Amino acid sequence: MSLLKKEDTIKIDAIVTSPPYNINKPYSKYNDKRDKNEYLLWLQKVANNSLQILKEDGSFFLNVGGRPTDYMLPFEICSIFIGAGYKLQNTIHWIKSISIEVADIGKKNNIIKTDSSIGHFKPIISQRFLSDLHEYIFHFTKKGDLAIDKLAVGVTYQDKSNIGRWKSAKTDKRDRGNIWFIPYNTIQEKRPHPATFPEKLPYLCIKLHGVKKNTIIYDPFIGIGTTALACINLNVEFLGTEIDNRYIEIANENIQLRYIKNKKT
């Protein structure tokens, strides 16, 4: 986090990011296979610095994953942020792929006609481990009591009778919950960065935090600009840092193209 430090006067409303997972991804300017203690100390600096630049009513949405041989890593990272002074307010599960059997849906909910597998994932070639179809999004705040805009990311009621049944159900929107199914693009040419999350992920995080006038979003590992694109669509200001000049060029191009596209529509 070289751009924003505690000495800076700017304060951030929400940070949405996904740091390298230390699982040997092929970055061109970053070693993604550090000694684990070194990696965790590095993330501790990220936690400490981010806490200083975040507003008192700010949010930090941290997307992290792991691997079967080190399944505790996401929780160790979470503990580091809590140790820095954050409160873990929500734990969101990003589901990349899911299998649904018709028998589990029931006759009343006629959603699918056949057993279905939806989404994509990288299979694990192992006789010991199941393929990992999800990652975590840890939602940190400073006090743990931040009001969030749950209906901004809400979904429609499957059973419309609930709209009149529940006092809180004033519209055809309900809490999405903490399980988010967000598939990602599998075409590598469209994912020149080895570890990008789908644009919908930061989009939902920002909306959940709440979009107000002059909202500023920061992504300290902005990569090819995915968080920035979500910000443009939400009409909020954004800042980002990235160490790889190639990714910066791609991010700038993506941002310019999005502005052009939005002006036409």
Residue map of PLM features:
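Core catalytic lobe of class I
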Residues: M1-I250, L257
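Conserved phosphoryl-transfer catalytic core
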Residues: Q256-N262
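SAM-dependent methyltransferase catalytic region
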Residues: I12, K264-T265
